[in-house]
Structures are given as structure tokens and as C-alpha cells.
């Protein structure tokens, strides 16, 4: 089971604190905080986090986005460039999500990463089931009581968004092509259940190399992080209480 800190609302000032030493090749680091006024400032906060986790200067870290579909800059997967990094240095992978006045950042060198953060109330108001659920998921959700069904749909949505971000394709892929199952007995989306990618016919990676981890959040939010790598990484939520 991943090492997840207790849910807490992390003030933006905490993003400036020096994080403890962590092996990014075996760990995915997640920070929850408050978004800045602009997307550019949020990207700078993510770049600063990469700098502190990798031990380089902030000036040596830059982020870029180029859409793999239209080849235009300014949108698409976030990529990290480390100026002057030694040959053979692990590649840092990053992801970012915003929802309901909150921000989630993810950094790892284990492999491509995607994170999704959602407002539970906002998703509950949206008619998602018809555009989100595979046939197997729809059957599982239909068997649940309404409150449990809402939690399940929220968990499935954040898991699929995280997977599609890690794959670098986003919502250009129909979410219904993916099927999320649950490793632990319990209702989908419950605290006792852990998601896994059970099906995606055109996945750009082996399904057993996609690792999903639910992130501890305040109760009004839900978050999931996905990492593509051979071995399941450890999840570290910062700031991490001593």
C-alpha cells in the first residue's frame, strides 16, 4: 500500500519549504496547495518543486508544452528540461491539476506521470456516466446505492484522467475505452478499494506497468495519480509530517 500522509489542506506558502530527501526514481511526490492567479505562476511553482527535489537551481528548470496532435505549443503534456544536467541523469516527469480553488502537483523520475484533482460536488452535478463508464463499470456502478455510486464515478473519473495524462493523450481518447477495476474488496471508490487499469485495447504501454494511487485529500475533493513504470512507486505526499 502506498505511503500516504493524512489528508490536509496545504497552504501555498508550504510549497516554498525544502522537501526531505527522496529518491524520485522509486517515488512519486505529490503536493496539494492553492493555485496562483495565473497558469504561468502554477507552472513556475511546479518547476521550483522539481528544482528542490532534484537539487538543482530553480533557474535551470524549465517546462514546455507541445500538443502531440496539432504540434502547437502552449498545451499538451508538460515536459521538463534541466539545463546542465549530467549525462545519464534520470528524466523528471511532471503533472499538474486544478479544481475548485485547489492545485495538485506531481513529480517523479520513475516514469511518465499524470495527476487529476476534482471537486466532488462539481462532478456530482455533471452527467458523466454516459460519457465516462465502460460497460463493465456501468454494471458495477448500477448495483450501488446512490451515494456509493457518486463516489465510484468520482474515483473512476480521476483515475481515467490521470491515466490519459500519463499516456500523453488526454481526453482525445474516449474514456469509455478504458476500464478501471479495484484491487481490494469493497465498493468502487470506497476508502478500502484501490484502482487499477483493467482494460484499454489501444494502451501505449503494458497494463501491468500502469500504477494508480489514490491521493489523500480533504473530503470535498478527490485525486488520483498514475505512473507508467515497471515497479509500483511509493507515493509521498508533501509536506510530510515527521
PLM regions: where:
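Core catalytic alpha/beta fold that binds nucleotide/phospho-ligands
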Residues: 1-242
